[in-house]
């Protein structure tokens, strides 16, 4: 495993992180606690030290599973978590929850996350899918600075989303706030991620890439020769069929990258 410092912070991360969303919510099929904990521990054994979760994953379970699986390794890992969604508000299916950003809510969300994680600090605390008006708000960043001073978080940033795009949000985060951004970036989906990376390099700001395997299309699981069926609870079930067909077409185009080597498509 290789490690590097997240630019603009003192956080040293493994270059490959673990996204806890996939093992803590029913959005990828049924949740299996034993399998999820085994995967987290296996990742740690292989050198992964950066684990990214959120309070909204599994209604808090995405943080609780971190405590259950990795609490004995707390000093060796970097925990990223996210906030901003009102967990007390009702949710319809896969629709987005209401967001809240007032100082009292943010502080309470942090305290609840600390309890679920079983730790007294969060390394990388991210505003979850914050919109431009929120990122422009000094109140939010004053609150986050207060959490840093209180020792409850080490540093903070913005998780840009929820889906691909959000150019203004990403650029404002990097250029004006000068804090790390978590973005969507993979071989299939390179824009606007490529632009964000260029700007971040110019500004000396870190970027964390998520969805590196294009929601499973780049992990070697799916090909034209294998039946592709998603569980009814899997969020990919609700995507347009064109998404899968387009992804398989792109997968055909990059076969040359690994056919003549010992590497896999995931690598």
Positions of PLM-derived features:
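Structural motif corresponding to the early beta-alpha repeats
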Residues: 76-100
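Beta/alpha (TIM)-barrel catalytic core signal, keyed to glycine-rich beta->alpha loops juxtaposed to Asp/Glu
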Residues: 130-267
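Active-site mouth loops of central-metabolism enzymes
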Residues: 22-34, 92-104, 129, 133
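Short, acidic/polar
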Residues: 30-43, 101-117, 163-171
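Active-site groove signature of glycoside hydrolases
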Residues: 114-133
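Conserved, mostly hydrophobic/aromatic
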Residues: 6, 18, 36, 51, ...
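N-terminal binding-site loop/beta-alpha segment at the start of enzyme catalytic domains
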Residues: 1-78, 89
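Short, well-ordered coil/turn segments that N-cap beta-strands
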Residues: 11-16, 47-50, 73-77, 119-123, ...
């Amino acid at each position: 495993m290789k490690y590097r410092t997240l630019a603009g912070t003192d956080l040293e991360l493994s270059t490959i992180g673990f996204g806890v969303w996939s093992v803590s919510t029913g959005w990828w099929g049924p949740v299996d606690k034993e399998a999820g904990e085994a995967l987290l521990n296996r990742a740690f054994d292989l050198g992964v030290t950066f684990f990214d979760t959120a309070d909204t994953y599994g209604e808090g379970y995405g943080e609780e599973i971190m405590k259950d699986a990795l609490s004995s390794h707390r000093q060796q890992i970097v925990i990223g978590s996210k906030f901003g969604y009102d967990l007390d508000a009702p949710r319809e299916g896969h629709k987005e929850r209401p967001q809240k950003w007032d100082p009292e809510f943010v502080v309470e969300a942090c305290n609840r996350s600390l309890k679920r994680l079983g730790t007294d600090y969060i390394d990388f605390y991210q505003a979850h899918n914050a919109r431009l008006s929120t990122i422009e708000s000094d109140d939010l960043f004053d609150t986050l600075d207060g959490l840093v001073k209180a020792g409850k978080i080490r540093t903070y940033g913005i998780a840009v989303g929820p889906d691909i795009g959000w150019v203004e949000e990403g650029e404002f985060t990097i250029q004006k706030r000068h804090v790390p951004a978590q973005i969507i970036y993979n071989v299939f989906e390179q824009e606007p991620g490529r632009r964000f990376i260029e700007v971040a390099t110019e500004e000396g700001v870190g970027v964390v890439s998520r969805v590196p395997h294009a929601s499973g299309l780049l992990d070697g699981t799916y090909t034209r020769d294998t039946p592709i069926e998603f569980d009814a609870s899997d969020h990919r079930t609700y995507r347009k069929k064109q998404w899968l067909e387009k992804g398989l077409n792109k997968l055909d185009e990059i076969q040359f990258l690994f056919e003549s080597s010992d590497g896999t498509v995931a690598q």
